Amino acid sequence: MILKEKRIFIVEDNMQNRLVFQMALIRHGASVDFERWGRDTLYHLQNLSRVDLIVLDLMLAEGVTGFDIFDQIRGLVKYNAVPIVAVSAMDPSIAIPRLQKQGFSGFIAKPIDSHQFPKQLATVLSGETVWSVGERTA
């Protein structure tokens, strides 16, 4: 179980994606918490004892973006060093340079590969970055 005892917080507005993420991660030993829209992310994070990794959708409903949420999370002392990975259908050639500049720990293109997803997050948890654009890796 490559994610045993790891707590992963996911911000994702699509229920089907949340279920796919959750199933893949729980199967590998992680505990998973969710925020659907992004607007209550800081509230939820402040009420958790710890989070080992945060997964952010970049294109959320109601005008909130993962880029905005990233900056808000980095403003919390408790979470300013927690790795944050973007998971998005956004064009990687546009997203990745911006994510790297902003300080994200990785990008995983949607649709995710549910077999690779836990391994990719484990890689980030080990201190490396992951820039996955589907069939190839940047």
Walk through the language-model features, giving the residues of each.
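Two-component/phosphorelay signaling modules centered on CheY-like receiver
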Residues: 15-33
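Acidic, metal-coordinating helix/loop segments flanking the phosphotransfer/catalytic sites
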Residues: 34-53, 61
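His-Asp phosphorelay/catalytic-motif detector in bacterial-type signaling
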Residues: 50-52, 77-83
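Short amphipathic alpha-helix used as the core "switch/output" element in two-component signaling
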Residues: 65-80
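Alpha4 helix (beta4-alpha4-beta5 surface) of REC/receiver domains from two-component response regulators
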Residues: 67-68, 90-108, 119
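C-terminal output helix
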Residues: 112-121, 129, 133
